[in-house]
Amino acid sequence: MLTGLSMADLSAQEKEIAIVAHRGFWNCDQAGLAKNSIAGLVQAQENDFWGSEFDVNMSKDGKLLVFHDGSVEGKSIEKNLASEFEYYRLKNGEPIPTVDQYLEQAKKYPETMLVYELKVHSNKKAESKAVRLSIEKLKEYDLFYPERVMFISFSKHICKEFARLAPGFTVQYLEGDARPDELVKYGINGID
């Protein structure tokens, strides 16, 4: 699935469209039809997509995994150790990527925007920890720049935390239950 974002006007008559690969450019043979895979990220990068969106969940031991759902085959990521997911495979045979593995590949294409979706967790304490760990990882891989990454989430708390800890970054709230004037008070500068 591809998602389009419009960018600022280049001139009065000309607009540029930015294409974001949702969960990577996974819907192709080269990526093995695997969402949130390293191969899907590579395909987005090599095909010059403006950005690539990916989903992040935190395990019980504070490890960040790139996976859309909060559970894998009924096993909660948040309630289990990351090591318990090492043997699960994506549709293309890849293991579930860690954020480290994903960011290592992301570094190779500085022109590709990372659309970092931090998933909802069970409580605000866990969400705050996941935000802090996410920022630490982005800094570790020298990717913590507003031109390289934007943050999105269905959790208002996560968005507030990213806005507080990463001023100047694009932070978009995905749930439809808040008005723009409410969100802007917290530094959240986008609604998707």
List where the protein language model places each region.
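Phosphate-group recognition and catalysis centered on beta-loop-alpha active-site segments
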Residues: S6-D192
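Bacterial N-terminal signal peptides
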Residues: M1-G4
